[in-house]
Structure formats: structure tokens, C-alpha cells
Amino acid sequence: MREHNLKNIIHLMLVCVLLGCSQTDSTSNQNIDFAANAEKLVLNEFQPSTLSKEEQTKELAWFTKTAEPFRGMTINVVSETLTTHEYESEVLTEAFFEITGIKVNHDLIQEGDVIEKLQTQMQTGQNVYDAYVNDSDLIGTHSRYGYVVALSDFMENEGSAFTLPTLDLEDFIGISFTTGPDGKIYQLPDQQFANLYWFRYDWFNDSQLKKQFEEIYGYPLGVPINWSAYQDIAEFFTKEVKEIDGQPVYGHMDYGKKDPSLGWRFTDAWLSMAGAGDKGIPNGLPVDEWGIRVEGCRPVGSSVSRGGATNSPAAVYALQKYIDWLKNYAPAEASGMTFSEAGPVPAQGQIAQQIFWYTTFTADMIKEGLPVVNEDGTPKWRMVPSPHGPYWSEGMKLGYQDTGAWTLLKSTPLERRQAAWLYAQFVVSKTVSLKKTLVGLTPIRDSDIRSEAMTNLAPRLGGLVEFYRSPARTAWTPTGTNVPDYPKLAQLWWANVANAVSGEQTAQTAMNQLAEQQDRVLERLATHGVQGDCGPQLNERSDPEYWFNQEGAPKPKLADENPKGKTVPYDELIQSWQNQ
């Protein structure tokens, strides 16, 4: 994730907002040849595409015609600073103006600031932005509070005339992530990236290293299927190999500084990877990866004593393993790093594997001249599905996938909401989406993933295309609907995790405290009664043994949390997907 100096642009946007200028010079629009502009864009910008050039031209003509009531308007939208959104802000806003006459100020700010602006508009009713690209992690929040427009309703009613006939919602791989407990779609996916396992393919195929590993551990060096194998491989490179080509090497990389990013290191599905929740895709039911249990659609508790799993043996195991691996196998400085500081480290060439690696780093990991890139431009590394802990079983989610999605608020005036809806659809339309995917590597459409262009690019992307085409993809999902207020609950995680990392508290004490704090938030939401029929309603406390004796989560402590390691050769794994 890169930050650009946008002060001048943002200053002009703010001046416009403060002065209330919502119109461009209408006479300038009269001189625009929308059809000619569309033709140029199809030829010069929006290639490749899964649509024919004729189909692209027809789709853009629909935008031109449908935008007529809003021609000359200026709308304001916002997203976090990702390469994908930079392309939208710098290129697609201009393209949209050229075919519609609608000017779009697409602001780029930090993710936390996006949520802050969103909350400000919700709480005050003042229109801060006309549309937001907001993480679908907030789906449980949006579907309960009533501030966000249910797009399913909007597309059938006041947004019907402005909904793209070729939008093809079924083509969006993340549409289930933006669907509430009521079955309604609340957000339109704009970009997605997963959190996967990353490893040095070249080292794992080194004959001497393979021989040495098998002699020590009794099974082949390969892609770890379970956490036991991950730990063995981490130990092998850090404690046994120690050095390659004169450089120290490590079998693990992570970060551990007391910082908000330590929170999403866990809420981005670490507990589900260990197996703390229940079966269910996109999220465990009745208990999800935050350890929150729901009955029907009502959250009823986080603590084991209320039927939750936030302080369950599986959750404590997940936290303890994170701490042990960070301290025993990662570079010493990793404990003092934040997410953004640790992100570039694997590209420096001294890390053998990383269990928690975001695919947004792909573009920065394939640059020429890096120690992890071959001379022909292909990567020395690969990404694959993450290994799972001993509490995990088939049918559970296995990892996290971030989905930034277009979100409309009811407090936005209807006309501005309709115009913003046009822009949101434009930047995810089939005319645009494949080119945008190639720029930002954050795919949202199945048709794009299976395109010839992605096939051609696949060898340079280290397994990204193979993962998104695989049946395994469905087990990587965002935070789900069990979380009724993402901002309030997410902020609890990092401080509690940090207490365990520092040694100030045990893993069990830290998770007990977190579970108790989550329950207090749920209790306050229940007391206020603002979330309707799907708002929290806490269970009474029971003996934890009662819940351990029930089927599913919370699960009792296993007698053996470290079964024998299992691995699979990377090429064999890829072949098995292709045969399905």
C-alpha cells in the first residue's frame, strides 16, 4: 500500500466542498463528444476486457444516456489508498467524466479515516461523501443499524433506472460477503485481496535442503498443510539452516508492535485458521472467527460461558502459537514492527515462509532486481492456501479475504446517491474491471479471473491466479455478520493481544479479558436497542463444560495440539486444483 502526495488535489476538493460547488460549467458539457470519447477509451484504455469492443462501446453508451439527468454535477467519493483506488482516482474519474459529463472527486485517505468519515455521516446525518468504498467487514454493522442503503432494494426501486443491465451480480466473487443476514446485498464489491501462505519455492525445491529436512523431521519439505508442519519448517530454516549464500535466513516473519495493526493480525481470521469457530462459508455458524455466537441473527456472547469461543482453548492456542513463532523463529526486530514495517521484509530475500501474507504485496514482490525475483522476471516464491491448526475441520473458513465495497448512505440526497451509484458501477463494469484488475491485482469478477489475460500473466504472479481459480478460494472470506459493530469491537483486540506479546499477561488471561470486553459491548448494544431484531441479546452465563459438551464451538482442549506435520508438493497441489 503506497501513499501519494495528494495535498494539492485534496485542497482543491475541500475548497469545492466548503464552497458548496456541486456544478461544473454546463456549457463545457455541450462540447463533449461522449460517443467519440467512449470509442477512444475502449481502444486505448480499457483493453484487455472480457467483453468485445462492440459490447464495451454499448455498455459505455448506456452510461452516457443514463447519466443525462446528472450532467454537470460534481460528486464526492472516498476510499483507502490502494493501487486499485489510485487507478480509479487518477484515471477512471477522468474517463467517467468523458462519457457522462459528471465530475467525480475520488479522495484517497487511510482506511481508519474512511471509517471515521462514514461514522461521522451516520451520526450527524450530514452528507460528507456521496459514496464510500468501505470494507465488507462492516456488513454486520451496516445490516443492523439502518444507516446504509440496502442495494437489493435500491436496485428495484429508486435506483432501478440507474442500474446497469450488464452489471451481472453473480459474476462478483465476493457478493456473498456483502449480503446481510436478511439476504439483502448492502455493498457492491470493488476490490479484493486475500491473506495466504507465502514461501520460497526455490529453497523448498533445493535437493540438499529437502534431504536435510526429511532426515530431521521424517517427512518431505513442502507446502505445510497443518500448523505442526509450519512450525517444523520455521524451526528448520531458523535453527538448522541458519544461513544461505552468506546471509542469515529465518523460517518465519510476522510483526508484534502494540499498534492498531496488531488487531487485524487477529481479526483477519487468525482464530479461524487455528479452528476456533464453527463450520460455515462464508463464516462459521453459530460461532464465527471472532468467537461470537449468534442465535438466529442475534449475537449472544463471546465468552465460553455464554457459548462463545473468544477465550476458548482453540483461541488461546492461536494466540500462543503466534507469540511462540514470533519470538523463536522470526528476525529479532519483528517483535517491534507494525504491519506496514514488516510487509516489505520477505522481498529482501531472507525469509523462507510467512503464514500470514496479504496478496496486496504481490506487485511489490515481482519488481526486477529483487533478491526474490529470477532474471527472467518470474518469482522465486509462491503463494498458496494457508495451513490450518489442530482445531480446524473441513467445512470451516480457512483464511481472510479483504473486500472493499461501494456503500451508499440513506443520508445522502437521492440525486447524488443515484449519480454516485453510476460511478460505482462504472468502475466495476466488465468494460473496465479486467484492466483495473491487471493494474491493482485485486480481482472481483470470476470472468476476469478466468480470462486469457490472467492466464498469460499467471507465471509472473506467483500463484495468485491459480489460487483465485481454485476451489479453495471460497474458504477465504472477510469478517461476517456475527459482528454487530465492527468499529467498537475491533478496537478491543490490539491492546489485549499486546499484553500477551509483552508477557504482561498469559495468552489465557488476555483472551479472557478480550471476551469479557466484547460481551460488555454486546450488552451495551442490547441495552440501547438500536439494532432491531438482529441486535445482541446476551445468553446467561453457564458452566463452560456445558458448552464444551455441545457440538461444535467452543471446542474443548485437545489432548494433542501438535500432531505430526503434513506437507504437499506445490506442483502437486496446483495439479489437483486443475483436475477438479
Give a label for each model feature.
Residues S52, G72-V91, F193:
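Extracytoplasmic "Venus flytrap"
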Residues L60-T66, T83-K103, W198, D202, ...:
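Short, polar/charged alpha-helical segment
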Residues E94-D171, D206-Q208, Q212-E214, V345, ...:
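Extracytoplasmic "Venus flytrap"/periplasmic binding protein-like
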Residues S136-E156, F172-Y219, Q231, D254-S303, ...:
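Periplasmic solute-binding protein
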Residues T179, K327-A332, E341, I351, ...:
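Extracytoplasmic/periplasmic substrate-recognition and gating elements
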Residues A229-E235, S272-G336, S386:
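Glycine-centered hinge/linker elements that transmit conformational signals in sensory
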